[in-house]
A protein has these predicted regions:
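Conserved catalytic cores of very large enzyme subunits
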Residues: 1-170
Length: 170
């Protein structure tokens, strides 16, 4: 099913069938999952947080399947972000952080967002949103979370290389 999802979101249907929809997927360490889903229940009444290990394992499988698909096909989406809580000079969920960093070292396919509080989220655009004040939430998952490139500085290495005529100057 993960493969179907990846292929489906990469199908061109926006702008005259030439572009696929922009899609973000966030992956969370234990403290983020606890903050986001701590009091939430499944339809059968069980608490989501009781399945935190299974949720983390599913996220890892999702990331590995996505990376495997991308190793064989050029897939633009989803844009992936891993959110990790970093306090007092260390990751609070060290096992998950080690996995996330090792995964990204191998595949280089994710943005890694480290923060000292689980009250903020980030997605592909590196824009930090406060989850304590979502503003609104609707039945299809829409919220007032910010997306965009506010206060984002991007170093355009390709442009720097273009403007320098030899490797020494670059």
């Amino acid at each position: 099913q993960i493969q179907r999802f990846i292929y489906a979101i990469n199908q061109p249907y926006v702008r005259d069938g030439m572009q696929s929809a922009f899609t973000n997927v966030s992956v969370f360490d234990g403290p983020y999952l606890e903050a986001l889903f701590g009091g939430s229940t499944f339809p059968d009444g069980t608490f989501m947080i009781d399945y935190i290990d299974e949720i983390k394992e599913f996220q890892k499988i999702f990331m590995e399947v996505t990376a495997d698909i991308r190793s064989k096909n050029m897939m633009t989406f989803p844009v992936l972000t891993m959110s990790l809580l970093y306090q007092n000079g260390k990751f609070t969920d060290e096992e998950f952080a080690r996995w996330a960093i090792e995964h990204n070292r191998k595949w280089n396919d994710s943005n890694i967002f480290c923060d000292s509080s689980v009250n903020s989220l980030s997605n592909c655009c590196r824009l930090k949103s406060n989850i304590e004040d979502l503003g609104y939430f609707n039945s299809i998952g829409g919220t007032a979370l910010k997306v965009g490139s506010v206060k984002v500085s991007t170093i355009n290495l390709a442009r720097i290389a273009l403007e320098h005529y030899n490797e020494k100057d670059y």
